[in-house]
């Protein structure tokens, strides 16, 4: 198995909190990513949305697009509606030869609201779980057929947050639904990344390796 090492532009600027690195240019981000030795970078808010503009920019700094975030509303949308919503990003990523789309369900998410407690995040009852898994399986098959697999990102403040959520998703979806294992989000949710890796390694397609300040979690 070969592993390629990339980086996310959130290390330079935060799309959710523009005041963090908002003044940092895309060129500085790409230049420093290359200088640090990375061969790939995920997409971000400052990245061009047209491949005719993005590919030359990446080539300028000897970088490849290694994935990028897509926030879905599959709990509310039909699969066909979600296909239409993701199409522009799908086409861009195919043009850039990215390996996957980092996919997360964000309907009802509290991740962007610092005044909300994590305990108020959205959660699904049994019937909705079944429908959600059926829909994401259908979408996963579609994206796999398009050559751009779905790598699901468990994320704090969203409907798939905990280790239990993540296991339930993987165990009840088609094998085309892959996983982005995020060590920071898993630890924040009091989960065990090592367990996920050992037991679901065949579904892991993308990994986010993150540090986390435990002292802040326990405040």
What are these regions, as identified by a protein language model?
Residues 18-32, 82-92, 189-197:
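Short, acidic/polar
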Residues 40-53, 72-84, 156-162, 183-191:
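Acidic-and-aromatic substrate-binding clefts and catalytic sites of carbohydrate-active enzymes
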Residues 79-181, 188:
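Active-site acidic/histidine proton-transfer and metal-coordination neighborhood
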């Amino acid at each position: 198995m070969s592993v390629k090492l990339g980086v996310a532009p959130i290390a330079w600027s935060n799309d959710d909190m523009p005041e963090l690195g908002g003044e940092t240019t895309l060129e500085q981000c790409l230049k420093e990513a290359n200088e640090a030795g990375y061969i790939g970078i995920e997409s971000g808010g400052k990245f061009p949305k047209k491949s005719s503009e993005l590919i030359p920019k990446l080539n300028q700094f000897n970088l490849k697009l290694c994935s990028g975030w897509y926030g879905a509303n599959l709990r509310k949308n039909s699969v066909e509606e979600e296909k239409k919503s993701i199409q522009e990003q799908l086409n861009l990523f195919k043009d850039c030869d990215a390996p996957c789309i980092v996919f997360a369900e964000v309907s009802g998410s509290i991740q962007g609201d610092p005044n909300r407690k994590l305990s108020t995040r959205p959660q699904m009852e049994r019937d909705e779980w079944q429908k959600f898994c059926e829909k994401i399986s259908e979408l996963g098959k579609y994206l796999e057929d398009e050559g751009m697999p779905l790598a699901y990102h468990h994320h704090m403040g969203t409907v798939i947050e905990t280790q239990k959520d993540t296991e339930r998703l993987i165990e009840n979806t088609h094998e085309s639904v892959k996983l982005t294992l995020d060590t920071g989000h898993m630890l924040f949710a009091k989960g065990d990344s090592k367990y996920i890796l050992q037991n679901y390694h065949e579904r892991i397609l993308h990994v986010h390796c993150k540090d986390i300040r435990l002292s802040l979690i326990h405040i």
